Design a protein with these regions (language model features):
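Short beta-strand element of the alpha/beta-hydrolase
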Residues: 257-268
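Short alpha-helix in the alpha/beta-hydrolase fold that links the catalytic acid
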Residues: 500-510
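Alpha/beta-hydrolase active-site loop
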Residues: 306-330, 346
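Gly/Ala-rich beta-loop-alpha elbow adjacent to hydrolase catalytic centers
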Residues: 339-344
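Short beta-strand/loop motif that positions the catalytic acidic residue
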Residues: 490-492, 496
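Short amphipathic alpha-helix adjacent to the substrate-entry channel of hydrolases
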Residues: 276-294
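Alpha/beta-hydrolase-fold enzymes
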Residues: 152-188, 328, 332, 346, ...
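Amphipathic, low-complexity, repeat-rich surface-exposed segments
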Residues: 1-246, 257-258, 295, 507, ...
């Protein structure tokens, strides 16, 4: 009875409910004061990021401004037409909103703006305030896009960069990225009486403290995963270790295996266990289950002592040493090899070095999302001009290595809405904990690059395209793409924003091999490769005619459902000889040193 009276009293006196909420509000305010002190401390320890690595050189914008001014003088009608079109749409929307409001309707006017998942909350469509903000933002974005796209007087590279970085500015200014104009965040704050904002501030400060004062949003719950426990769990042994890498040999899961072993070289920009996340999507486990003796390289993480490690070291002490070790362990003359991304590029360089030296270690090579022709560098090319590369060169000259922070930041901005803004909204505005997502956990587990190697790769390959043109100097030779003569199977991904598939295709075309297979998988740089048959996702296409242009190849390609793994497995089996009794990891000369996944994947360096 007392409870009912109290409830009725509060309903009759709204101020009673407000008074009841005051202790919680006061607690949150006190918590915010404490968090503010932590915030100031984190910001005061902010790392110094070179100006050259924070954005394109000012010359890009000044040239664009000059071009726009010249166009305005020389062709004023075009500018006037653009502005009148923009003004007309903006004013018409304002008039429609005013008319709806004048009729006493709390409803939004007609909304013909395109669908955008950032604006999924129904209030963006129905509420006049939020809909007005959304429509005005979309009109501004369209006007900016049109102005940049139709700008004349810039070369193709400059125009691509201007389009990319103008999109970054437009995306950053979306009303969804600000608390006062985000209905999801405002609703959550009211429903939780401010708790969501306090949790969001806690999340933000934790990210700042973990990243030397840089705001790098956590994409995954780091406490949910442990490498070697619930990631990278396929059984195996480390059978070799040097200053460059650990070599893992995986335990067989079949009684018989193919004679010719397989070795995978993952990119050293990230850690190898992207191929062994969980049993359900592990390419490593799948390969072992198909009856192959599998070795995988786990690269050492660079630090200041890696300053002078270059591409030649990767070829000599990495690839050639790994080939020799696997040949001896398995008592075979040849191996099959896989290179993923930059590791595929370096595998191709190693093949040319071996040809020059008369070494015949490799029976076939598979290239995952690999660039060997850098004439078109795709979306990532906006970060490969001298302004950025000069900044990287200065950074590695001082530090001796390229911190993983810079590579991670670069790749994140290629998908900023998915990898920066939406995660930040969930974490900082809604106060949600990062998801327990294995792929995103791996994405945040970056590695550093040796200083010398980073510059050789960026200057000689990415910028100057020497491997596909004049020759790239490595290991005492001038490596040329035409000297890659072993059988090749290349897998590229249609929406890859790091290794554009058309460039990958063009590189395969230039190789000297008479036995070439090209597979185009759906999706992107990671999901297109980590695409197990059980998921039945994405699909892939093939075309035996590699003499045509990329567009011609795609137009004539045959579409297949599901994963490309089984097709590649059949191709690889034909290159792998007869079946023999399964091999256990190691040999008399190379006894097991430690269980997989080894120690290099768990820390920066083994001393």
């Amino acid at each position: 009875m007392t409870t009912d009276d109290s409830t009725n009293s509060e309903s009759r006196d709204p101020s009673a409910a407000h008074r009841a909420a005051l202790p919680k509000l006061e607690k949150n305010m006190k918590r915010i004061q404490d968090l503010t002190q932590r915030l100031m401390g984190a910001m005061s320890n902010k790392r110094k990021v070179p100006q050259d690595l924070q954005g394109p050189a000012p010359e890009l914008y000044s040239k664009a401004g000059t071009v726009a001014f010249q166009e305005m003088i020389q062709n004023p009608s075009k500018i006037i037409e653009q502005q009148i079109g923009y003004w007309g749409k903006t004013l018409q929307h304002f008039v429609d909103a005013q008319q709806a409001f004048g009729k006493g309707e709390l409803a939004a006017p007609v909304d013909d703006t395109p669908t955008d998942r950032r604006f999924a909350n129904p209030l963006w469509q129905s509420h006049p305030y939020f809909n007005f903000l959304k429509q005005q933002y979309m009109l501004n974005a369209q006007a900016m896009d049109k102005a940049v796209t139709e700008m004349e007087g810039l070369d193709d590279s400059e125009k691509r960069r201007l389009e990319f970085f103008s999109h970054q500015i437009v995306d950053m200014l979306s009303p969804t990225n600000f608390l006062a104009t985000n209905p999801d965040a405002l609703t959550k704050a009211v429903e939780t009486e401010g708790d969501s904002l306090v949790r969001g501030l806690e999340n933000m400060i934790a990210d700042l403290e973990a990243n030397d004062g840089e705001l790098v949003v956590s994409l995954a719950d780091k406490s949910a995963f442990t490498v070697g426990e619930n990631l990278a769990t396929t059984p195996g042994e480390v059978v070799f270790r040097n200053h460059m890498f650990e070599l893992i040999q995986y335990a067989p899961s079949t009684e018989k295996v193919h004679t010719t072993p397989l070795i995978i070289f993952p990119p050293w920009i990230n850690k190898f266990y992207i191929l062994d996340l969980k049993a359900q999507n592990s390419l490593i486990k799948w390969i072992v289950d198909q009856g192959f003796t599998l070795f995988v390289v786990s690269w050492a993480n660079a630090d200041a002592s890696s300053r002078d490690i270059g591409m030649t070291d990767y070829v000599e002490d990495g690839y050639l040493t790994a080939f020799e070790t696997v040949r001896e362990i398995c008592a075979v003359k040849k191996v099959n090899a896989v290179g993923y991304c930059i590791a595929g590029t370096t595998l191709s360089l190693s093949l040319t070095v071996m040809k020059e030296r008369g070494i015949d270690y490799v029976n076939s090579a598979t290239l995952f999302t690999t660039l060997t022709d850098f004439s078109d560098r795709g979306e990532v090319g906006v970060f490969l001009n001298d302004d950025f590369v000069d900044g990287i060169e200065a950074e590695v000259k001082e530090a001796g290595f390229l911190d993983s922070y810079f590579m991670s930041k670069t790749f994140s901005y290629l998908r900023s809405n998915d990898l920066i803004y939406q995660p930040a909204i969930r974490s900082y505005m809604l106060g949600e904990a990062p998801p327990a997502f294995d792929l995103l956990y791996w994405n945040g587990d970056g590695t550093n690059l040796p200083g010398k190697m980073a510059i050789e790769y960026l200057r000689g390959l990415c910028q100057n395209d020497k491997f596909a043109t004049t020759g790239f100097d490595v290991a005492g030779i001038s490596a040329k793409i035409a000297d890659v003569e072993v059988p090749i199977c290349a897998i590229a991904c249609e929406s890859d924003h790091i290794a554009a598939w058309k460039s990958s295709y063009q590189g395969v075309q230039k190789m000297g091999s008479k036995d070439k297979t090209f597979i185009l998988s759906g999706s992107g740089h990671i999901a297109g490769i980590v695409n197990p048959p059980t998921k039945k996702k994405y699909g892939y296409c093939t075309n035996d005619d590699l003499s045509v242009s990329p567009d011609g190849w795609q137009a004539g390609a045959r579409q297949h459902e599901g994963s490309w793994w089984p097709m590649w497995g059949d191709w690889l089996a034909k290159k792998s000889g007869k079946k023999i009794d399964a091999r256990t990891p190691g040999s008399a000369s190379y006894p097991p040193l430690a269980p997989a996944p080894g120690s290099y994947v768990l820390r920066a360096k083994v001393v």
